[in-house]
Amino acid sequence: MKKDLVFFLIDDDKDDIEIFDLALKQTDCLVKLVSANNGDDAIKKLQADDRFIPDYIFLDLDMPIMNGKICFEEIKKIKHLNKVPVYIYTTSQNPLDELKYLLSGATLFFFKPSYIKELVTFLRGIIDNTNH
């Protein structure tokens, strides 16, 4: 029996979290969404239980308390997460950001799409890739 995939979304925008959740539901796949509202909460959650290993992490860059840059660096220090793909999921259009994160080990730099259909297609691609 396959276990449900776990996606961990780190984003301070409640609307973006709802849209992400809705897009996941539209994939018609068994995926559990866990979220944190800022980098500090995310790191605490990830360090609190070394059995919590999401299948994928999606990280916004522009957040209060602990921004995505610092959060990304902290995630990379957590040994039990070293094989978890980290997707930078952001509105930042800075090509230097994209290059920096990809060179630092991010799996992909993905711009938050304007349409939910684009997000559904993107997420379905990740899920389909996981199941093969």
Question: PLM features: what roles do these ranges have?
Answer:
Residues L59-D60:
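Active-site residues of response regulator receiver
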Residues S35-K44, G68-C71:
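Helix N-cap/capping motif at the beta->alpha junctions
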Residues K14-V34, N38:
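Two-component/phosphorelay signaling modules centered on CheY-like receiver
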Residues A48-F52, K76-K83, S104:
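Conserved phosphotransfer cores of two-component systems
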Residues M63-M66:
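Receiver (REC) domain active-site loop signature in two-component systems and cognate sites
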Residues M1-F8, D15-L22, K112-H132:
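Non-catalytic signal-transmission and effector/linker regions of two-component phosphorelay proteins
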Residues I70, Q93-F110, E118-T121:
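Alpha4 helix (beta4-alpha4-beta5 surface) of REC/receiver domains from two-component response regulators
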